[in-house]
Amino acid sequence: MENISKCMERGTTVGTMMVSERFKDQVQIPNTDDNFPEGPPSTKSGVMFTKEDVEYLIGMPIIDFSYYKTAFSYNAIVEGEATYERMEFVGDSVLGFIIARYLYDNFPGKDEGFLSRLRTKFVSGKFLSSIALRMGLHNYVIMHQKGLYRGWNTNPRILEDVFEALMGAIYFDLGINAAKQFFMTTLAKYADMQSLMLDTNYKDRLLKHTRKVELPRPEFVSVFEKGGANPSFIVDVVINGQKISTGTGKSRKDAEQNASKIALHTMGVPEEFIH
């Protein structure tokens, strides 16, 4: 097991700055590049991120700074220190509850199917990571230099987890009402609610349309798949042996949705039914 002196020599990194164990209560974060979302003033000046910086980030006073250090820790500063995984586990449930209650209260005339589809959008990695990036959470991720060289602090999956861990930290420190207040404020500030409200489950629309006009169930045929850092998928929609459309995306699911949307247009389905 590494002792503390070795950890100090190795250091750990927040943003692009190396820090060591002596900064266990204040950790260094980088100067914010103009291409990134604006962070707290201390982020832009390159000084320590402190309790006050976290309060600036979430918009309310905090009590226990250690919860937030844990929420932002992708790598432990020293052997045995907590990282965000357990906090993210709790934050995921806190976020799910807050979103479910928000949808229930704000859409009284909508059925369970609509609420479920909208909840799926709210908790999607794409949505949460985009909000995290706009907030500048990548500036707070505590990570070793190797990860930063590879851009892991802006990785959508990591940002999604860090956002959920932050929800967990606020819940543990300040309670469920504070966590709800933070999420609602963040939603109003960073989310494109108009786009979010669009029912974009084109695959479901296509399946309903083919049943309505008594056509065979569409087949979704994978034409091309490439994984790795830049994934790419191509899917054909085939009905009754005939190719109707082709869709592309960064996941098979996205490719199926895009192919379904094109198929609906190709089949002459009215725009109001598609959306």
Swiss-Prot record:
Limits of the RNase III domain: 51-175
Entry's Gene Ontology BP terms: regulation of gene expression; rRNA processing
Protein family per UniProt: Belongs to the ribonuclease III family.
Pfam families, per the entry: dsrm (PF00035), Ribonucleas_3_3 (PF14622)
HAMAP family: RNase_III
The protein, known as: Putative protein A464R
Gene Ontology molecular function, alphabetical: double-stranded RNA binding; ribonuclease III activity
Annotated S-S bridges: none
DRBM domain ranges (all copies): 201-269
Keywords: Endonuclease, Hydrolase, Nuclease, RNA-binding
Keyword Cell wall biogenesis/degradation among record annotations: no
UniProt superkingdom: Viruses
Statement: the UniProt record of this protein carries the keyword RNA-binding: yes
